[in-house]
Every structure is written in structure tokens, then in C-alpha cells.
């Protein structure tokens, strides 16, 4: 029964979610400087049912869906749109979360806030798409991606109320900016003449998160008014949110003593059980069974609290008459995160006893002793008692901030009925900064009992040692770092549109233009770990123990019943006052291997034409064109030179050009059945982080490094799309699409096993958890080195199914129901083959093989209800793209999210709204599958980064004056 109810409610919500985006607004007027995607829609008739729908006046979700459907039908290529229900009323609080309902889009969430952050399109990574703002390419980053220098776009920087419409293009068009092999997403900001009558909109909301048990405010206000030919719009948004996360971490893998003790190490970390200790007891198992059983890299609890604030401003000054449309648009956004993280558990990686006379638990005498152990059916050694265990109690306190600003001057002049000229000048800037301290202490050489239990997310841990005695803690360590990433862009374009007649009733629309885009990305890193370590050593164990507290610095953490709820740790106030990360890192020497500035200058020209007419009484629309671009790249970085390996300033430059043809067609098979097809060539440029940077450690608390390659070529793709779209009723669509991309020169990664000493990096490249008692990183520490190169030919293909229907044919009171659903399937696509130790090839997929989204809604009079469910399948984890010798495949587990909202119009000017996010309280986690099939999938027995985010409930008022 519950499944039947859910199956009914879920579809109802999807249409609503989409609906809020596209329904209540009048068809948006062409912006003063039409976004490249916006201009691609063909003028002309669409399917009969779509035309008929335009004559029906509806509001709310249904109206939004209908407008999005109209835009899709009018386009010649493959385009989907989400339109604000009304000015300042976008479907979701986050643009990326609205986009995930579009077939082919898979959402990537920020791990700290659980908000939608980036999107991947049709199986391609996030940096394979281009995001534009009113047609101009923009870049920005936030939270965990600061310093990655990727080309992707972080949507969580912006409040969705700042936008009026989003267009998403999957098929190539000559007018679209190059670089988006996956697609182009165009964000369009509102302008006053979008609603010439003027508007004053506002909303106030309180949000409660069940994990943090905190309530946070959000507010939005917008004023828009026109005076004759002049108009002005200004809007502001503010929100706060506090989210807690908690669960189990293995921190990157599982391994056995048999493989971890080999030279070189098999698996992703070294470890060796100590069978020579007199306490060793195999509990009835053979030595071989225990030796081959799997243990996690670290067995620990993780908890975090992320305090996020976001502020945004949007404005537009517009002049519009019958021939001239000029606007000055601006946007500003600031995103701040204060993140508190704590962890407590047993260190298993790099544990080995070679010197029994050393203090128990310290380097050389830290091999775990099996005393009373149990091996589960998956050959995991996750229950039992072990001697000589060492605990690490750590905290990381982080601050990150992103400031984005944008200004654009746009003009459109209608010279006559056939010719119009458009010009745009825009600038944008994104400045992001992140800094943090990680402070830890250890308890060495004690006996512990662990039990993975049935929950696995909150296992148990106990010991005879006193966790509350500060004298038991020593081996204190500190790690820190500061990263700044900047993006600056300048863009100018001039475009001419000309309508012309062809033979018979055929007409054409020619568009040609010149575009110049200059972008600069800089990454600047500093690390004061050595200076802080000097101070820590000066304080000594006694001084550090005085700074410890035993009540956890993060409140309301769900830890389960079997984990210690009190242990020695450090507060944010103590950590920052004793080791001020901003002061220390600002004065520290910058990290040359990870710092660079790269400038790209792209000059492009394009010409394309739409052709519209009939063939045998059936409508046919064609768009054909070509785009030429020349790219110049200048890099300023630092390179090792000479026998001493010192870093010296280095400059590199290069250029290349591309010719990118594209053709699309839409054919009306019947009045309500449309066939589309498109062919074209696109490119994507490799991430600047792997072009401009030297050998770096992206995550100082993970033993993996990345080496850049300045010789990488841009990746190219030849694309084919075809689809059938059946507009079978007003407000309804059933469609099926097939896509195929042939990629050449794709950027692929390969990994090799090496040691930290062989990388030639300073100790400060690694986090404090890797430091020995001497304050240094062991040069023999196993490291995974990832390098990049251009691959040969690869093929990516898949299909998409989409369904949308307004059930207005039902009798009252069921007439208000509607549904929206989509399904995407991507054939397994991975650049590297996954080979078992026995030589068998395993089919793996680097992106989810399938994803689906469904929304059901009900709208009747003042009441509207919506539920949405979005699901994506499992995918190969990028940190473990191939076999490390342990036959374990690391998967990102499949996951689905259920959201809902209820709104009630108190009157025409005021609406009460209730939103519920992540109603399913979805568990996000990785797991390690045994590729041989002998020890099971590991889906519930070898989990990693398994955490709950909790549910968020929002209640608020939205109104207009």
C-alpha cells in the first residue's frame, strides 16, 4: 500500500517542480542581448497541440511546465528549459536541483551542505559543460572544489531567485560558445520589461535541519517597475543553513595483511598484522584466513557541522522602444561556509611491527595484534579484539568564501523588419578563498574491541583505556593550508540577424557574429604547517593537553549507541586562537608546485541559418552553420630546474584553432509528432589544473598525488542526436531520444604506485596524519600518482525517455493532477579497463549507467502539492579508476532523493509554502566490491564515507505587493 501511495505522489511532484520553473510567467521577451541559446529557437509554427496550449491562460506549476514545453517545441535543436513561475519565483532554491529533472543531467551534491553543486551531462564529467550568464561564459567555484582549477561551474554560489529562466542545449549550434562537449547551460537574469506592469515580490522562510536541529532564516525581495520606455529592477536574497553529517569512514580503502605487507604494496595502503606478539590468537581460524581478511584503512567515526550563508543581488536598468532595447545588468553573490569536522578512531594504515622494543603503538611497533577476532562471510575482519591499536582524535576547522560579480551592457537595434543588430560587453569575476587547520592527538598501543554491527554506519568501539584522561594523549600534530582561486572574464560580441525569403513558402533566418572571450584563472596556495609545527613542539605534550576538551565541540551529532560520546579533542576557538590559519598562512611561503596563472584568449566567428518550410505538406525546420575559433593560452607557473630541484618561474604558451560545423533539423511527421536530428562537432578544453600545475597532492589527507601535463590537446567530439517527440495532448509530451558521441583526444588518467620520497615534495604537502614522531613524512610512504594524457577514440552513447502530462481530462476533484518523468541510460563508458589480478576484464562505468527523475503534482484552486524523486545508479569512484592489486572495485553507491512541497494561496497576493528536502534521509556512501566474486559486493560490509545528511523542512510566506 505504501508503495502505491508513493507511486501516486511521486509523479505528481515532478511536474510541479518543473512547473514552478516554467509556468506562471508570460512568454519571456527576448532579452536586450539575447543569450546565445535563446536565439536558437526558430520562429514559426510548432506542433498543433503546443500552439493550442498558448491560447489557454493558466498559472502556477501547470503554466510553468507549458512554457518550458513551448520553448522545447519551438527549438530546432535539442533544448530543454526551466522558466520561473513568476519573476523571482524559481522552482527550487538551487538551480542545479531544478536541472536534474532534465533528461541526461546528473546532479553532483556538495558534501558539506548537501546542496546541488555541479552537473554532469550524458556521462561526461562536470568540466565538459559550459555555463553562460545571459550568453556570456562564466566560471566560479566553491567549498571543496576551491583550488581544483576545474572548468566546471558551481551553481550553489547563487540563489535561484536571481534568475528568470534556464535554457539547456544538448545538441551543438554554431552560435553557442565552444567548450561544451556535454552541453551548454544558459542562465538568464530578469529584466524590468519581462513584466512591464511592474512587480514587488518577497519571501521569508525558516529552515529546520533534523541533523543539526537548528532553524535558519532566508529572505528574498525584488522590485521591478517601468516608466514609459525606461525600467529598473533590483532584487536581493539572503539565506543561512546549518547542516550536520555523521557516519563511518574507512578513508579510502580496505586491505589485507597478506597484500599490505608485500613490497611493493598491493592495494592502496600498507599494513601488517603482528602474529609474533604473545597475545596473538587466531580464534580458530588459519593464519591464511586471518592474513587475507580485510580491514579498513582507518576505522573511525566522522561528524561535521557546516554553517552556510549566501547573499545575492541582481539589478537591471533597461530602455526599450519599438526599435531599440538596451540594458545594463549586474549580479553579485557571496557564499560563505564555516565547517567544523571531527574524527575519532583506530589508525590501521601503515601499521607494522619491525622493532618490538619501541614504545607500543608508535612507528616501528604499531602492528595490530589479533586477539579475539571474527571473519564475516565477506572475508572482513571487522569484529573482534585487537592489541596494540593506536587512536587518532582530530578536528578540522575550515573557512571558505566565494565572491562573484558580473556586469553586462547589452543592446539590440531593430534596423528594419528584417535586420537587427545585437551587441554585448560583459565582465565577470569570481574570487574564492579557503583555509583550514587540522589538529590531532593520539593514544598509542592500547587494546580495543570493534564491532561493525548490523548498521555499519554507526559501528561500535571500546577499550580499557580512559578516553577522558588527557595524560593518555600524545603524538600531537598540526596541518594547515590556504588556497585562493580567481576567475576573471571579459567578453564582447556583435551579432547580426537577418530574415529573408527563399523559394515558394520557404523562409530563412541568417545569424552571424564575432565573439571575443578572455579568461584568466589563478591558483595561489600557501602552507604554514612547518611554522605551526614549530609552535606545537614548543608547547609540548603538556601544553597541548591543557588545550583539550572532552565534551564534543559539535552538538547534536548522531553517533549511534556503540561509539564513545566523549573523548579528547579541541574546540574551534582554541585551534584558531593558538594556530591562526589566516595569519600563519598569509605569512608563509607560497607553494610553487600548486600555484599558477593561466590566460585564455578565444576569438570566434560563426555563421548559421535557419530554414523553414514544408515538404509534402509537413513542416520542416533546419539550422545549419559553422563556427571557427582560435585559442591562445599563456601560462605562468613554477618548474623544477637544476640539480637541486628548486622551483623557478616558468612561462609557457600555445595556440590552436578549431572549425566546428553543426546542423539540426525538426520535422513535423504529423500535427503532434515531431522528429529531430542533429549532427555537429564540439570541443572541450582540459582542466587548467592538469595543464598548468606541477606535481601536487590535491587532498593532504589522502596519499595520492597528481602530475600536470602542459602538452594536453583539446578534446573533440562528433555528436549525433535523434529523437521523436509526441505532443499528444495540451501540456503533454512523450519522447524518446538517442545520442552518440565519438570522442578523440579525450583526457584520461592513469595511476602508478610510488613513494612520497620519489615525488620530491615537501613534508607540508601531506596532512598531519602522515607525520611521524619526528614531524616528518616517511619517504617510503606509498603514494598513488595520477598522470594525464590524451586517449585515442572512444564512443559514448545512450538514450533518454521523457514523459509529461497534465491530467486535466479527469473529472473534479482529480483534474488538478499532473506528472513529469524522465529516464537516462548511458552505456558503460570508462577510459581505462578494470583488470583483475587474474587478468579478467570487468565492465565498469565511470558515471551512473542510468538515472531517473519523477515528479507528481496536484494543483486545484489555492492548493498545490508536489513530490519529486531523483535517482542515479552507482558509478566508479574517480580516486580508484583501476585495480591497485587488491581486486577491489570502489563504487559510489546508487542513491535517490525524495523532496516535496505544499503551498496554499491565502489570497491573490500571499502564499503559504512548506518545502521538505531529502525526505528519504538518503545515506550517501562508497563501497568496495570484490571483483573476483568470492567475497561479495561489499555494499553493506565494506562501506566508506557512509553519512546521513538529515531532512530539511522549510516553511515560509511568498507574496507580492
Language model features with spans:
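Outer-membrane beta-barrel signature, preferentially recognizing the C-terminal barrel domain
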Residues: 402, 594-600, 685-743, 764-771, ...
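Extracytoplasmic beta-strand/coil segments of soluble accessory domains associated
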Residues: 96-141, 170
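Short loop/turn motifs that connect adjacent beta-strands in outer-membrane beta-barrel proteins
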Residues: 176, 192-198, 228-230, 323, ...
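Flexible glycine-rich, low-complexity coil/linker segments exposed to the extracellular/periplasmic environment
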Residues: 261-296, 358-389, 448-476, 524-594, ...
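C-terminal beta-signal and adjacent terminal beta-strands/loops
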Residues: 742-744, 871-882, 903-961
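Outer-membrane beta-barrel translocator/receptor signature
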Residues: 145-153, 161-168, 175-273, 307-312, ...
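Gram-negative outer-membrane beta-barrel transporters
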Residues: 742, 750-752, 759-879
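N-terminal periplasmic "start-of-domain" segments of outer-membrane beta-barrel proteins
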Residues: 57-93, 118, 141-143, 147
Amino acid at each position: 500500500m505504501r508503495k502505491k501511495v508513493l507511486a501516486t505522489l511521486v509523479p505528481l511532484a515532478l511536474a510541479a517542480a518543473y512547473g514552478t520553473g516554467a509556468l506562471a510567467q508570460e512568454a519571456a521577451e527576448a532579452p536586450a542581448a539575447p543569450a546565445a541559446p535563446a536565439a536558437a529557437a526558430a520562429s514559426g509554427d510548432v506542433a498543433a497541440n503546443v500552439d493550442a496550449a498558448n491560447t489557454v491562460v493558466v498559472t502556477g506549476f501547470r503554466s510553468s511546465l507549458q512554457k518550458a514545453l513551448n520553448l522545447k517545441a519551438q527549438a530546432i535543436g535539442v533544448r530543454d528549459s526551466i522558466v520561473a513561475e513568476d519573476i523571482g519565483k524559481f522552482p527550487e532554491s538551487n538551480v542545479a536541483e531544478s536541472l536534474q529533472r532534465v533528461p541526461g543531467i546528473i546532479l553532483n551534491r556538495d558534501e558539506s551542505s548537501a546542496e546541488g553543486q555541479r552537473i554532469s551531462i550524458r556521462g561526461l564529467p562536470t568540466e565538459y559543460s559550459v555555463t553562460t550568464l545571459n550568453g556570456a561564459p562564466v566560471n566560479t567555484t566553491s567549498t571543496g572544489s576551491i583550488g581544483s582549477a576545474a572548468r566546471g561551474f558551481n551553481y550553489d554560489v547563487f540563489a535561484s531567485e536571481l534568475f528568470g529562466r534556464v535554457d539547456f542545449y544538448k545538441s551543438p549550434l554554431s552560435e553557442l560558445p565552444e567548450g561544451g562537449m556535454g552541453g551548454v547551460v544558459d542562465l538568464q537574469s530578469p529584466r524590468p520589461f519581462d513584466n512591464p506592469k511592474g512587480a514587488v515580490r518577497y519571501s521569508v522562510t525558516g529552515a529546520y535541519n533534523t541533523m543539526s536541529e537548528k532553524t535558519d532564516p532566508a529572505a528574498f525581495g525584488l522590485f521591478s517597475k517601468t516608466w514609459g520606455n525606461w525600467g529598473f529592477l533590483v532584487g536581493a536574497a539572503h539565506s543561512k543553513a546549518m547542516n550536520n553529517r555523521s557516519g563511518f569512514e574507512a578513508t579510502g580503502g580496505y586491505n589485507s595483511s597478506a597484500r599490505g605487507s608485500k613490497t611493493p604494496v598491493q592495494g592502496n595502503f600498507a599494513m601488517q598484522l603482528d602474529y609474533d606478539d604473545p597475545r596473538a590468537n587466531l580464534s580458530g581460524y588459519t593464519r591464511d584466513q586471518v592474513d587475507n581478511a580485510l580491514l579498513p584503512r582507518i576505522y573511525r567515526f566522522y561528524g561535521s557541522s557546516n554553517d552556510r550563508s549566501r547573499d545575492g543581488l541582481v539589478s537591471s536598468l533597461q530602455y526599450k522602444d519599438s526599435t531599440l532595447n538596451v540594458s545594463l545588468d549586474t549580479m553579485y553573490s557571496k557564499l560563505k561556509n564555516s565547517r567544523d569536522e571531527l574524527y575519532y578512531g583506530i589508525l590501521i594504515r601503515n601499521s607494522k611491527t619491525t622493532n618490538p622494543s619501541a614504545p607500543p603503538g608508535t612507528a616501528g611497533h604499531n602492528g595490530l595484534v589479533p586477539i579475539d577476532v571474527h571473519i564475516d562471510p565477506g572475508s572482513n575482519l571487522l569484529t573482534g579484539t585487537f592489541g596494540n591499536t593506536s587512536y587518532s582524535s582530530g578536528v578540522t576547522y575550515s573557512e571558505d568564501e566565494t565572491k562573484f560579480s558580473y556586469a553586462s551592457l547589452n543592446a539590440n537595434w531593430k534596423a528594419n523588419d528584417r535586420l537587427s543588430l545585437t551587441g554585448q560587453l560583459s565582465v565577470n569575476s569570481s574570487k574564492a578563498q579557503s583555509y583550514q587547520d587540522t589538529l590531532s592527538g593520539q593514544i598509542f598501543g592500547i587494546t580495543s574491541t570493534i564491532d561493525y554491527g548490523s548498521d555499519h554506519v554507526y559501528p561500535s568501539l571500546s577499550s580499557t583505556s580512559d578516553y577522558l584522561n588527557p595524560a593518555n594523549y600524545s603524538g600531537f600534530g598540526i596541518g594547515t593550508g590556504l588556497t585562493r582561486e580567481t576567475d576573471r572574464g571579459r567578453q564582447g560580441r556583435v551579432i547580426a540577424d537577418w530574415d529573408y525569403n527563399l523559394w515558394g513558402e520557404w523562409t530563412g533566418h541568417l545569424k552571424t557574429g564575432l565573439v571575443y572571450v578572455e579568461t584568466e584563472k589563478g591558483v595561489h596556495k600557501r602552507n604554514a604547517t612547518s611554522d605551526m609545527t614549530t609552535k606545537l613542539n614548543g608547547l609540548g605534550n603538556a601544553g597541548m593537553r591543557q588545550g583539550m576538551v572532552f565534551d564534543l565541540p559539535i552538538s547534536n551529532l548522531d553517533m549511534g549507541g556503540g561509539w564513545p560520546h566523549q573523548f579528547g579533542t579541541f574546540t574551534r576557538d582554541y585551534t584558531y586562537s593558538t594556530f591562526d590559519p589566516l595569519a600563519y598562512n598569509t605569512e608563509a611561503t607560497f607553494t610553487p608546485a600548486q600555484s599558477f596563472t593561466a590566460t585564455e584568449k578565444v576569438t570566434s566567428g560563426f555563421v548559421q541559418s535557419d530554414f523553414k518550410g514544408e515538404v509534402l505538406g509537413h513542416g520542416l525546420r533546419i539550422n545549419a552553420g559553422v563556427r571557427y575559433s582560435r585559442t591562445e593560452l599563456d601560462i605562468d607557473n613554477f618548474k623544477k630546474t637544476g640539480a637541486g630541484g628548486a622551483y623557478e618561474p616558468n612561462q609557457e604558451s600555445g595556440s590552436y584553432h578549431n572549425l566546428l560545423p553543426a546542423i539540426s533539423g525538426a520535422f513535423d511527421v504529423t500535427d503532434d509528432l515531431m522528429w529531430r536530428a542533429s549532427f555537429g562537432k564540439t570541443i572541450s578544453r582540459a582542466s587548467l589544473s592538469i595543464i598548468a600545475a606541477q606535481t601536487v597532492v590535491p587532498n593532504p589527507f589522502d596519499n595520492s598525488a597528481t602530475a600536470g601535463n602542459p602538452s594536453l590537446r583539446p578534446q573533440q567530439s562528433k555528436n549525433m542526436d535523434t529523437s521523436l517527440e509526441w505532443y499528444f495532448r495540451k501540456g503533454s509530451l512523450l519522447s524518446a531520444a538517442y545520442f552518440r558521441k565519438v570522442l578523440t583526444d579525450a583526457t584520461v588518467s592513469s595511476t602508478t604506485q610510488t613513494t612520497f620520497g620519489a615525488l620530491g615534495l615537501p613534508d607540508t604537502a601531506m596532512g598531519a596524519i602522515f607525520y611521524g614522531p619526528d614531524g616528518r613524512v616517511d619517504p617510503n610512504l606509498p603514494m598513488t600518482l595520477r598522470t594525464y594524457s590524451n586517449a585515442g577514440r572512444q564512443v559514448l552513447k545512450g538514450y533518454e525517455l521523457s514523459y509529461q502530462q497534465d491530467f486535466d481530462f479527469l473529472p473534479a476533484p482529480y483534474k488538478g493532477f499532473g506528472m513529469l518523468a524522465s529516464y537516462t541510460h548511458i552505456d558503460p563508458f570508462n577510459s581505462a579497463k578494470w583488470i583483475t589480478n587474474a587478468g579478467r576484464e570487468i565492465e565498469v562505468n565511470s558515471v551512473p549507467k542510468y538515472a531517473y527523475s519523477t515528479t507528481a503534482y496536484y494543483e486545484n484552486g489555492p492548493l498545490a502539492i508536489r513530490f519529486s524523486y531523483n535517482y542515479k545508479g552507482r558509478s566508479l569512484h574517480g580516486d580508484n579508476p583501476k585495480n591497485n592489486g587488491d581486486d577491489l572495485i570502489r563504487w559510489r553507491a546508487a542513491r535517490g532523493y525524495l523532496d516535496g512541497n505544499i503551498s496554499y494561496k491565502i489570497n491573490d497576493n500571499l502564499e503559504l509554502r512548506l518545502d521538505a528536502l531529502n525526505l528519504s534521509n538518503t545515506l550517501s556512501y562508497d563501497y568496495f566490491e570484490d571483483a573476483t566474486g568470492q567475497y561479495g559486493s561489499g555494499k553493506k560490509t565494506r562501506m566508506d564515507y557512509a553519512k546521513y545528511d538529515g531532512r530539511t523542512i522549510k516553511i515560509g510566506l511568498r507574496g507580492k505587493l
